[in-house]
Amino acid sequence: DVNRSGGVLLLAQMSSRGNLLHPGYTKEVVDNGVAHDGVFGFIGNGSRPAELAALRATVGEGKMIWTPGVNLAVGDGEMGQRYGDPTAAVLSGSDCIIVGSGIHKADDPRAAAAAYAEASWKGLLQRNG
């Protein structure tokens, strides 16, 4: 106990092409992270629902999963990013989607933010049935 508030999100997966994670990386990170109370969650791959679902199955419900790599325009980005559907990410186990360019590069960022909120809420309602 170090008498502090807060916690850590560990990077378990990446959505960008050509990332430097080796094949056993996710398992190592999750094994270490679930054992420590200071770790409240993991960063997962929002562009690959199957990978994200596998992460959720391994992590269980006791830790959060936050996911970048989501965009309403599913596909590849300008710098090697891969984007998946935000609703699919939540259905696959994400607790929180992380959105950057999908909002700040939109013609109407406010409307885009509302669309992402709606998409993630839809996924959460479907997931929790």
Model-derived regions, located:
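C-terminal helical cap(s) of enzyme catalytic domains, especially alpha/beta-barrels
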Residues: 90-92, 101-129
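Glycine-rich beta-strand-to-loop/alpha-helix junction loops that act as flexible
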Residues: 67-70, 99-102
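Conserved active-site and cofactor/substrate-binding residues in soluble primary-metabolism enzymes
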Residues: 24, 28, 81-84, 104-107, ...
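Generic secondary-structure signature for well-ordered alpha-helical cores
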Residues: 3, 35-38, 95, 118-126
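Functionally constrained cores in energy, signaling, and assembly domains
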Residues: 6, 12, 44, 63-66, ...
